[in-house]
Amino acid sequence: PKQLGGDPEAAKKGFEDGMAVTDGRYLMGKALYGYYYFRAIDDREGYLRTLQEVIDTPANVMPGQRLANELAQIRAKRWLTEADDYFE
């Protein structure tokens, strides 16, 4: 969070640049974006939407990264269940 010295907009750009490299097919990047960025800016809807998109995308969207994508989906499912812990 900004109040603790972070820069959410710089983080957003970094996440977006990283996701653009694989056209969003490397799901771990999107999962981490959802988990860290949207918590930092206190955006519950963005958090829920982004993690659900990770879950809804087929893991084989990037065949060479299927295992990483499956792990991203497992994490996204867990993080969705934790939403009430992070947002009021």
Predicted regions and their residues:
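Conserved structural position within tetratricopeptide repeats
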Residues: 16-20, 56, 63
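Terminal, low-structured helical/coil segments at or just beyond the last alpha-helical repeat
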Residues: 60-88
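TPR/TPR-like (Sel1-like) alpha-helical repeat modules
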Residues: 10-12, 45-61
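Short coil/turn linking the two alpha-helices of tandem helical-hairpin repeats
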Residues: 1-5, 34-43, 81-88
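Alpha-solenoid helical repeat scaffolds
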Residues: 27-32, 64-67
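Short coil loop/turn residues that delineate tetratricopeptide repeat
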Residues: 23-25, 60
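Alpha-helical adaptor scaffolds
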Residues: 1-16, 23
